[in-house]
């Protein structure tokens, strides 16, 4: 008995060598969401949603925007006298127009297919203005008298700079027949108009002829216009109206004009010298003297993140727009420091290293690794190979998400005239619906990728554990907490061989077998002793019980409580 007690004491005092498999932990409080859980604390995370801008209008890749200030696109193209600063403009990256610019059509009227023209401008980066019909060439008509107080310049009546309002001369208005052949290599934007007088008296006063027309023709256009004489309310002091038209004249095509009155003739046209990605943005901002790769109406974005929630309308190399308020991608592991002793929940993908109850804050040079203890001491060592593979996989995750979302829906900010409000409302609903779906897809993708990332790390820890288990086999005992207890002495060289996969099982198998047998013998001898003590205890207890029963019976017989024969 004394031998057994002494052996057990010796065994308990000699601590076996151990190696444990674990993972990195730190003091991070960053949290991500997954398919299965919300607010999961992780060691590392990356915010992939840009939420900030600089509140300025900037150059786009070094090219200035065309900021029209108080002028509209129509005021710029026709040449409103208050927009003279834009008579000749350099190349632009995008066009900025206020929501309600003051200098629009100074003479009241409308611009036919104006929204379509704006859409065309969203694919143009530079105009070159050229003269196609000189003002001085109208010898049979008054080319300088067509002015209005509605379009003042320096306190005097004026008119749009790029067109000519032709009036009768010497009480006659000869029929006009003019042509222009586009000999340029570029397309040409040509503008003209028709004047609608207030009454018949104004018609004859300006054009002499009571019944007039305007005919315009190209290889693709066949237009005949007649003035609409009607009494109207005054706008800008005018009861008349001017309606403007435009067309794109292809190279080697000709445009032909014929009219006997009410003609607003083109003097200048715009040669489209550079096409490319542009946009017309509605913004009240001023020029910020800055440069960017991505511009929105409310400010520039300088970000390498794949998503943003700033504004759906953008131009340039921009992140994808979503309506989300938070998109955080897990790039590290579940952060469960060992002191918390908190088991991880099972995920949706991959193997789970749930048998390891916490991470190691002492292991700082890798995501997964080992902790050993032997006679030479103890320490941490990262598994560089599995860590590097994991880093490579996670590093490509953002690019993977971008690739999966590379069919970005673009809200182009189309404009509609007053007759197309139902179409505009339908378009807005469709765009909102697309953006809702796009946002849902982005959020779902991030949730699934986070789930995969965390379970990917769990799987890597489990694989590392299995790698050690398959090497050690019965030379060590699994303790159930990610650790192995060796049945032999394992110095630092031995520990390193386990870590790098070169552990020599036969070298240590004999020592391990003897240790196992020694432990088994102690257990068996202990079990035998316990059996003898158990039998002795049982017999002694039974004998004592019998004596007590006999004594009780004799006492009862002596006092007559029990009849004895």
Swiss-Prot record:
Bilayer topology annotation: Single-pass type I membrane protein
Q: Which organism is it from?
A: Influenza A virus (strain A/Chicken/Shantou/4231/2003 H5N1 genotype V)
Which HAMAP family does this chain map to? INFV_HEMA
In terms of domain of life, where is this protein from? Viruses
- The record places the lipid (S-palmitoyl cysteine) at 557, 564
Q: Which residues are glycosylated?
A: 26-27, 39, 181, 302, 500
Q: What is this protein called?
A: Hemagglutinin
Q: What is the lineage of its organism?
A: Viruses, Riboviria, Orthornavirae, Negarnaviricota, Polyploviricotina
A Pfam family the protein falls into: Hemagglutinin
Disulphide bridges, residue numbers: 20-483, 58-290, 71-83, 106-151, 294-318, 490-494
Question: Mind telling me how this protein is modified after translation?
Answer: Palmitoylated.
Q: Where are the transmembrane segments?
A: 532-552
Misc. comment: Major glycoprotein, comprises over 80% of the envelope proteins present in virus particle.
